[in-house]
Amino acid sequence: MSPPLDSALEPLSEYKETAFPRTEKDPSQYKEHDLVTPEKEIQTGYFSPRGSHSSHGSHDSSASSNISLDDARMSDVNNSPNVFHDDPDTIDEKLSMYWKAANETVIREPYDYIAGIPGKEIRRKLLEAFNHWYKVDEQSCQAIATTVGMAHNASLLIDDIQDSSKLRRGVPCAHEVFGIAQTINSANYVYFLAQNQLFRLRSWPQAISVFNEEMVNLHRGQGMELFWRDNLLPPSMDDYLQMIANKTGGLFRMIVRLLQTSSRQVIDVEQLVDVLGLYFQILDDYKNIREEKMAAQKGFFEDLTEGKFSFPICHAIGEGAKNRTALLHMLRLKTDDMKIKQEAVCILDNAGSLDYTREVLYGLDRKARSLLREFKTPNPFMEALLDAMLSSLQACH
């Protein structure tokens, strides 16, 4: 058996070359015609309320046939006041002219329901910790925090539907309350609202690119996890770790890369982000089996009920556990039966998979702290975050 930490980190060595792609230009190097700025979006009519162009009077039908759509749009703009005034909030103000607050409440309700329930706040703490080094201003930090928080909570709405989950943070999942269709629409809607927050940043062209890239990675990771589950195809440990790098690591990288777009500090944190992403997700997999608090909030060994290949399960199957076939059958059942779940835990125990997972987690904790010591500037926020994760691991029975 290979050393736990080495086997956990090795699959990411090639991935790290593309995890933090470098932007070719900073915003100051873009020429004006290269960018479609929010001001230009307003000018070309993309954000104009329905019917707003008709208010400027009718055009001669014979002349209009020779006028391009862009010319028509610009004609309207030239005869109307500048509504943007360099303030992104104006976009929302224009949209609100024909969109009622009551309607907004209705379509956001599934999202607001889950967002209003306190979570781990790991992403907010990560942003605070990394910004200790990047020193991004408070207003930009708030925009980044809002973007990542909205994207994360919206992804949970979709996650719970795809996993047929019943509980989230100790309460019924949003789709159990509002229905599947409305919850899907609310989640997708909030993805775009999250992206719109980035227009508040001076570096918004880079920030939008980062957001899109990491949302693509998130969906790649989620897609592979669903494929393995629905086809009962056990992934290799390498494939599983790559999935984590995309799904969980995607939002972690989004935080750091968005901070980088707004910072003058040049600090290489790639390896630390990789380790934290692995640490967080594998710890979550372990707690799903071993932590009483998570059992109360989501249900004991909910990963088995969802038919999900978690880190301990992947290890047991990969090691050729004596009852490998029985474990696969239990995953296929997607059962809530406590006796079956307890039998599955016994299989993992006998295969040494829970001990292995715990050993990997302690190794990741040591690795993260070793990397932290290499930075010139001490980071008490990152130390506190690691301490909290270690305490959570130690609390598992």
Curated annotation (Swiss-Prot):
Binding positions (Mg(2+) 1): D159, D163
Positions annotated to bind dimethylallyl diphosphate: R168, K247, T248, Q281, N288, K298, K308
EC number: 2.5.1.-, 2.5.1.1, 2.5.1.29, 2.5.1.10
Site entry (Important for determining product chain length), positions: Y191
Biased composition (Low complexity): 52-67
List of residues binding Mg(2+) 2: D159, D163
Residues given in the record as Mg(2+) 3 binding sites: D284
Cofactor(s) needed by this chain: Mg(2+)
Name of this chain's protein: Geranylgeranyl pyrophosphate synthase AN1592
Organism in which the protein naturally occurs: Emericella nidulans (strain FGSC A4 / ATCC 38163 / CBS 112.46 / NRRL 194 / M139) (Aspergillus nidulans)
Highest classification ranks of the organism: Eukaryota, Fungi, Dikarya, Ascomycota, Pezizomycotina
